[in-house]
Regions:
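Bacterial N-terminal signal peptides
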Residues: 12-23
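Low-complexity intrinsically disordered segments
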Residues: 1-2, 23-24
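Bacterial N-terminal signal peptides that target proteins for export
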Residues: 2-13
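Extracellular glycan-interacting surfaces
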Residues: 16, 28-733
Length: 733
């Protein structure tokens, strides 16, 4: 198991209310110990942690402390924020306290730390498509152990999973005053705070509020060399638009009272990130698009870029792009001990990098006159015990940073995690996959069968066979990328099916997988009959389902079941029986999935992931969200509510308790008005909450699952919106 921090952080129930001076931004303290270490005993006697995969998602930026050695913060697009401790050699997740009504706060669009105090950290949080776009400033004075939540939705919204999310930083602390902050919004212009982020006021001097790509003001950079009277007098603001559309760099020399466009910037490019050298120069990376990848309309291809040096006093520009390179550039950092030593990274560039293809990193020792391609010079990757990294590169390298207090070392972010080198000037430089404690995958499926290891399906990186949840598992091979559907045959051990852009079947528990010869549509969901002989596939975006009885060699259309996002679920006993929930009724098939008929009416809005009681035919449980939890004992002909469950987002089963015959039931739901993870040892007659407010993870996310371990009593797994697969186990076995 991962090292458990022998420290129980007392619950902190603090409610703070404050009215904003400029607008109705509401403030409330997170009523738990947010940022507490992931694997600590919860109030219910459970230890919660992440199933170890190792990274797996886009880390959009890293911000090392300039005042305290060994401390850095990282932000991600859907998995929250993390704090690195060199002393502990791991990352600590900071936002596991986020509830289901705050899931969007796991998308971090900006991060700032006080340059003089690493304990003071601010996050700009929100995702446009979650929680009605709720956006907030999260403010901490204790390294992210607790946060104050300042709701800013009424003033501006952000999108931590939007285009340009690796740019920035759009949130900055004034180097002359730790309580003054600046924020470049995506649609509503420039904002300032004079009270540490509690209240925000719009700065109307900047004439830009929004951009055509909805990225807006992507860089806000107060100049430390300009501090006078307790605040920076000079500010630079980068705008995410082509210079041909309008100025994309503005400058203020009077603490933001007035702004003027900076002439001479590249016309056909957009600024990505920027860094001062402390000697009068500003370095900016550019690309033809906000990134990290092209837009669908083709207006921002992200296939070209440059690096420029701006002389602040002389108001002049110099192109310092590595000679011969036209690729898009993103990350940039300057050695704080040597203003002539720079590092930059490309983005959306896929060139040979060891056994894979990815971005390039360049170092200059003469202010950009000459560059060394540190990847081409000699590249060594250390997977640090994460076996699936084989064949995967550093890519989407949106942020690269020298360690300010040990500038031989450098960090670079990637679409699959974070890498660090202890000596970027070494030949070869060894880049270590530094992701212990940082789990940022989107789980989409999970199977636990008696006598077999846990098996997962995730976005981007297929999924894994997990022999031990504390150690990274074996990635499914052949790899197909995002795997949206996974199922197992209840009565044929070792038989499973998974689907993404291809469909594969295994008969040996995932040691080997064989592609089906045919497929009607891609991705979506798939069900496998209890004997493993029949497959029912609901392709993504399709309004019909398909059935195969020859391991995918041929497919026929399923009758009686039409509608998008439907999914079939196999009965665990009878191989001829399948079920589906179509948002108004329970549908059943008695002919091996060839046709479905309506059995019973059900309220709309429930989870399409029906759960069948293990080892019993026709015993169905349906999570109806606000409709609670219902159960059928007659194959879906009738349903009865499970008493006491007012809300249920997911239901699953696990191994029975010692001395019990009935499987343990687990739910993500509300009992007694409190939402959380619950278990029942008596098939739903009584419930015990087994998580606490510090371990909510934003709820079950896109995977919509909660799965009990069929081999270990009391162990339960849950999907998240971007924090990987989390699991709880009794603190006392």
């Amino acid at each position: 198991m991962r090292t458990t921090i022998a420290r129980r952080i007392a619950a902190c129930v603090v409610v703070v209310a404050a009215a904003c001076v400029a607008a109705a931004a509401t403030t409330a303290a997170a009523g738990v110990p947010p940022g507490a270490d992931a694997s600590i005993p919860s109030g219910a006697g459970y230890i919660w942690d992440s199933v170890a995969i190792g990274g797996g998602g886009f880390v959009t930026a890293i911000v090392p402390s300039r005042s305290e050695p060994g401390i850095a913060y990282a932000r991600t697009d859907v998995g929250g924020a993390y704090r690195w401790s060199a002393k502990e050699g791991r990352w600590t997740p900071l936002l596991d306290w986020v509830g289901e009504d705050q899931t969007g706060l796991l998308g971090i669009d900006g991060l700032a730390i006080d340059p003089d105090n690493a304990a003071h950290v601010w996050l700009l949080a929100g995702i446009a498509y979650l929680n009605d776009g709720r956006s907030a400033i999260l403010r901490s004075t204790d390294y992210g152990k607790t946060f104050e939540v300042i709701d800013v939705t009424a003033q501006f919204k952000t999108h931590g999973n939007g285009f340009g999310r690796q740019g920035g930083e759009r949130l900055a602390v004034d180097p002359g005053a730790g309580k003054r902050l600046y924020l470049g919004s995506r649609r509503d212009g420039l904002f300032e705070s004079g009270d540490g982020g509690k209240t925000w006021q719009r700065n109307t001097a900047l004439p830009v509020t929004a951009t055509p790509n909805d990225v807006g003001l992507s860089i806000v950079l107060p100049d430390p060399a300009s501090v006078k009277g307790g605040r920076a007098q000079r500010l630079f603001v980068g705008v995410s638009r082509y210079g041909s559309v309008g100025p994309n760099l503005y400058r203020s020399d009077d603490a933001g009272a007035t702004f003027a466009p900076v002439a001479g910037a590249p016309a056909g490019l957009m600024p990505q990130r920027a860094a001062f050298d402390g000697a009068g120069k500003l370095y900016i990376t550019y690309a033809n698009g906000a990134g990290p990848h092209p837009d669908k309309a083709g207006l921002e291809p992200v296939d070209r870029g440059q690096v420029w040096q701006y002389d602040i006093a002389g108001d002049s520009w110099r192109n310092v792009t590595p000679v011969g390179w036209t690729r898009p550039f993103a990350g940039v950092s300057v050695d704080p001990r040597n203003p002539r030593r720079l590092v930059v990274s490309t983005i959306n560039t896929f060139i040979a990098q060891g056994d894979a293809r990815g971005d390039r990193i360049f170092v200059s020792h003469d202010a950009g006159a000459n560059w060394v391609d540190v990847i081409a010079r000699g590249f060594k990757r250390d997977a640090a015990g994460v076996p699936w990294l084989e064949g995967h590169a550093i890519h989407w390298a949106g942020s690269v940073e020298f360690d300010p207090l040990d500038p031989r070392a450098a960090w670079v972010t990637s679409g699959n995690g974070v890498f660090r080198t202890a000596d970027i000037d070494a030949t070869p430089a060894t880049w270590t996959f530094t992701v212990k404690g940082l789990e940022e995958t989107v789980p989409l499926g999970l199977v636990s069968m008696p006598g077999a290891p846990l098996v997962s399906a995730i976005g981007d990186y297929d999924g894994f066979v997990h022999d031990d949840p504390a150690r990274p598992g074996r990635i499914h091979r052949p790899e197909i990328g995002t795997t949206t559907g996974l199922d197992a045959a209840a009565r044929r051990p070792g038989s499973m099916v998974r689907v993404g852009d291809a469909m594969l079947v295994t008969r040996d528990g995932g040691l080997t997988w064989t592609r089906t010869a045919a497929l009607q549509g891609k991705r979506g969901q798939v069900a496998m009959a209890s004997d493993g002989a029949t497959l029912v596939h609901s392709p993504q975006g399709a309004s019909v389902l398909y059935r195969s009885t020859d391991e995918g060699a041929s497919w026929t259309r399923v009758a009686g079941l039409e509608g998008s996002r439907l999914r079939a679920v196999a009965d665990p006993v009878n191989p001829k029986v399948f079920y589906a929930y179509d948002d108004k009724a329970l549908m059943a098939s008695l002919d091996g999935g060839a046709s479905f008929q309506a059995r019973a009416s059900l309220p709309p809005g429930g989870s399409r992931l029906i759960r069948a009681y293990p080892g019993r035919e026709g015993d169905l449980w349906v999570a109806l969200r606000d409709g609670g939890l219902v159960r059928s004992r007659d194959g879906g002909a009738s349903f009865a509510p499970v008493a006491g469950v007012r809300y249920c987002g997911a239901v699953g089963f696990g191994k029975a308790a010692p001395g019990k015959r009935e499987p343990t039931v687990y739910i993500w739901g509300s009992v007694g008005g409190v939402r959380g993870v619950y278990r029942s040892l008596d098939t739903g007659r009584s419930w015990q909450r087994i998580n606490d407010d510090a371990h909510q993870y934003g709820g079950p996310g896109d995977g919509h699952f909660i799965v009990g371990d069929m081999n270990r009593f009391g162990v339960v797994y849950m999907s998240t919106a971007g924090r990987g697969i989390v699991y709880g186990r009794p603190a006392t076995p």
